[in-house]
A protein has these predicted regions:
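N-terminal binding-site loop/beta-alpha segment at the start of enzyme catalytic domains
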Residues: 1-79
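Short, well-ordered coil/turn segments that N-cap beta-strands
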Residues: 9-15, 49-52, 76-79, 108-112, ...
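Short, acidic/polar
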Residues: 31-45, 91-106, 150-155
C-alpha cells in the first residue's frame, strides 16, 4: 500500500474505504450487511494497509459512524477516520455539538479529519470555519477538510480558517475528471489532498454495465446509465479494458490506479464484499506506464455525458409505446 503524507494526519493510504453504504438501506445491503460483512470489510482493509476511512454524520443518520467505530475496535485511534459535518446553521456552538455526536458514535476522543460536507450556498465560510478553528486549536481534531468545494471556495475556506484546509473530497473519476483542471494542480502546489469519491462512477468503470445490462436500485437513476451516455462511454471503457488486459487486472482496478497515479490524490471507494476491498487495495500498487496514463486521461477528457434532463427525456421516450 502506498501512502501520502498530509499535514496534521501523517501517512494516509492512497486507497481508503468509503462507508456511506454502512447503515444506508437505499443501497440494498440491509441490516445483515451492517452487522456482519461491513465489519469483515473493515478488518480486511486494515490487514491490507488501508488507513483512511471516510464517513459522515448523515450517512445512515449516524449508523455509518457507529458501525465503523465498532468495526475498527481498538485500532480506531491508529487510523485516519474522516467524518463530515453537514453545514446547517454551522455556528461555532453547533459545530462543536455535532463534533461531539460524531466522536461519541465513532468512540473517539479526537477525530483526525473533520470535513465540511458541502458548501453552504447562503452561509459563507467566515461563519463555518471559526468553529472548526476552535476544535483544531483545542486538539479535538487533527485537521480540517472540505467536500464538494470549488477551488475558489476552497481558498476562501483557507482564509476563513487561518490555517490550511488540508483536503477537498470531490466527485472525481475517469468519467468525471474536472478536478484535473484546477483542484489537483492546487493540491500538488500547496501540499494538500484531493479525496476522490465515487471513483468507479457507481460501477460504470468496472466495465460490467452496458445498454443491455444496466444496474438496478439507487444507481438506476444515475444519468450515466442512460442509453446515450452508455454509448458515449464506450470509447473510454474500451481504453480502460485495453489497459486492464495489458496488466492482467480488472478494469475497475485500472480506474483506481489512474487516480492514485495523480499527484496528491487518494481514493475512497466503497466495498460490498471482502473480495472487493481486496481488489481495491491492490490497485494502489499498479504502475501505469506514461503512455497508458496519457491514453486514459485523453479518453476521460473526451467523454462528454449528456445532461440529466436529456437522460430523463430519453427514458420517458423509451417507455412510451411504439
Amino acid at each position: 500500500m502506498r501512502h501520502l503524507d498530509v499535514d496534521g494526519l501523517g501517512a494516509v493510504s492512497r486507497v481508503g474505504l468509503g462507508t456511506w453504504q454502512f447503515g444506508s438501506r437505499e443501497w440494498g445491503y440491509g441490516d445483515a450487511y451492517a452487522s456482519g460483512e461491513a465489519k469483515a470489510i473493515v478488518r480486511r482493509a486494515r490487514e491490507l494497509g488501508v488507513t483512511l476511512f471516510d464517513t459522515a454524520e448523515v450517512y445512515g443518520f449516524g449508523r455509518s459512524e457507529r458501525i465503523l467505530g465498532e468495526a475498527l475496535g481498538e485500532e480506531r485511534a491508529e487510523v485516519v477516520v474522516a467524518t463530515k459535518v453537514f453545514p446547517v446553521a454551522p455556528f461555532p456552538p453547533v459545530v462543536r455539538n455535532r463534533l461531539a455526536g460524531s466522536a461519541r458514535r465513532l468512540e473517539l476522543d479526537r477525530l483526525p479529519l473533520y470535513q465540511v460536507h458541502q458548501p453552504n450556498p447562503v452561509v459563507p465560510d467566515t461563519v463555518t470555519m471559526p468553529g472548526m478553528r476552535q476544535l483544531l486549536d483545542a486538539g479535538r481534531i487533527g485537521a480540517v477538510g472540505v467536500s464538494n468545494y470549488s477551488l475558489a471556495r476552497w481558498q476562501a475556506a483557507d482564509a476563513a480558517l487561518g490555517r490550511p484546509v488540508v483536503s477537498n473530497q470531490v466527485h472525481f473519476s475517469l468519467a468525471a475528471p474536472s478536478a484535473l483542471d484546477d483542484l489537483v494542480p492546487f493540491a500538488e502546489r500547496e501540499g494538500r489532498m484531493v479525496m476522490a469519491y465515487s471513483p468507479l462512477a457507481q460501477g460504470l468503470l468496472g466495465g460490467r454495465y452496458g445498454v443491455d445490462d444496466r444496474p438496478g436500485g439507487v444507481r438506476a437513476a444515475n444519468p450515466l446509465f442512460g442509453t446515450e451516455n452508455l454509448r458515449r462511454a464506450e470509447p473510454l471503457l474500451g481504453v480502460l479494458r485495453e489497459v486492464a488486459a495489458a496488466h492482467g487486472v480488472a478494469a475497475a482496478q485500472i480506474a483506481l490506479a489512474w487516480l492514485v497515479s495523480l499527484p496528491r490524490v487518494v481514493v475512497i471507494p466503497g466495498a460490498s464484499s471482502v473480495a472487493q476491498v481486496e481488489a481495491n487495495a491492490a490497485a494502489a500498487d499498479i504502475d501505469l506506464r506514461p503512455d497508458e496514463q496519457a491514453a486514459l486521461t485523453a479518453a476521460a477528457r473526451a467523454f462528454r455525458p449528456v445532461s440529466a434532463v436529456r437522460t430523463l427525456v430519453e427514458r420517458v421516450r423509451e417507455r412510451l409505446p411504439v
